[in-house]
């Protein structure tokens, strides 16, 4: 639980950058994968109040923390794994995940689930910033290559990757769209 608080505080800048890359708009249905204590959801609601937010996280402790922060605002929180939870097909306009991708049990399966859950033309944004002892720009670039490969394997198009120097380490945000047809 303490790790969730620490990551949340360090993720504020990453959250804003990822939200900018995602381009949320009024009326969007958005899924956050790995919502932690709910700070990114809170930031999205500050930016655009008329969105429909859902979140999925494996941690019961994070679900309880996030519920106190965003539940009164009509956010739906789910305890579960992106790889196995039966998300509705073609339901979300946008999917966002910040510093969560590398802790999924199966990234390829998680990306395929995101693809299935997105509406045609929907967009996903996944950001990672290595925090391990061996964190380096090379590791960040490796994460980026893996995200691109997973997006391609799932059938996404318009895949883009951006890098940004945010302390303590170089960060990567990969975005991709589900084909409109």
Swiss-Prot record:
GO biological process, one term: methylation
GO molecular-function term, one example from the UniProt record: methyltransferase activity
Annotated keywords: Methyltransferase, Transferase
Taxonomy, superkingdom: Bacteria
InterPro entries linked to this entry: Methyltransf_25 (IPR041698), SAM-dependent_MTases_sf (IPR029063)
Organism, as annotated: Bacillus subtilis (strain 168)
UniProt key word Cell inner membrane: no
One Pfam family named in its UniProt record: Methyltransf_25
Family: Belongs to the methyltransferase superfamily.
Designated name of the protein: Uncharacterized methyltransferase YdaC
Keyword Mitochondrion: no
CDD domains linked to this entry: AdoMet_MTases
Enzyme Commission code(s) on record: 2.1.1.-
Annotated gene: ydaC
